[in-house]
Amino acid sequence: SVVVTSSTAGLYGYPNRAPYAAAKWAVIGLMKTLAMELGPFGIRANAICPGSVEGPRMEGVLEREAAAKGMTRDQVYDGYASGTALGRFVEADDIANMAVFLGSDAARLVSGQVIAVDGFTINPDPKV
């Protein structure tokens, strides 16, 4: 089984992040092509699209955006988190658990799929 990671940017696009979104759309296209080409050999291919992930990269985004907008880091965090139905960021374990599932026999007929692990993004570009 092949499991690739893309991003919710590959599903929705994001203003002011065209190169990043384009790269993530490309990952999804690659995965779908692999699913078609490798399927006859019994090899599945799927993509995981995480939303905003807790960690050092996102901390940098929050700090830079807070400074640019004259807000606190927590105000920016809350703005992003409120853009999901579940109201929180993704943790690394959320992504890992999906990857384990997709690589397991429990997902033996799951191929060519794009799975968002994002708490259901309802607003990909919250105005914070």
Q: Residue locations for each model-derived region?
A:
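Active-site helix of classical SDR
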Residues: A23, M31
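Short, small/polar-rich loop/turn modules that mediate ligand/substrate recognition or access, typified
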Residues: G39, R44, V110-G112
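Active-site loop immediately N-terminal to the catalytic Tyr-X3-Lys motif
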Residues: Y12-A18, P40-F41, G87, D105
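Residue(s) in the substrate-gating loop at a strand-loop-helix junction
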Residues: S7
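Short C-terminal tail/terminal secondary-structure segment
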Residues: Y12, S111-V128
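Short, flexible catalytic-loop segment of classical short-chain dehydrogenase/reductase
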Residues: I28, P50-G60, R64, A68
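A short hydrophobic alpha-helix cap/turn motif
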Residues: L38-P40, V53, G103
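C-terminal helical subdomain
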Residues: A47, G55, M71-A106, V110, ...
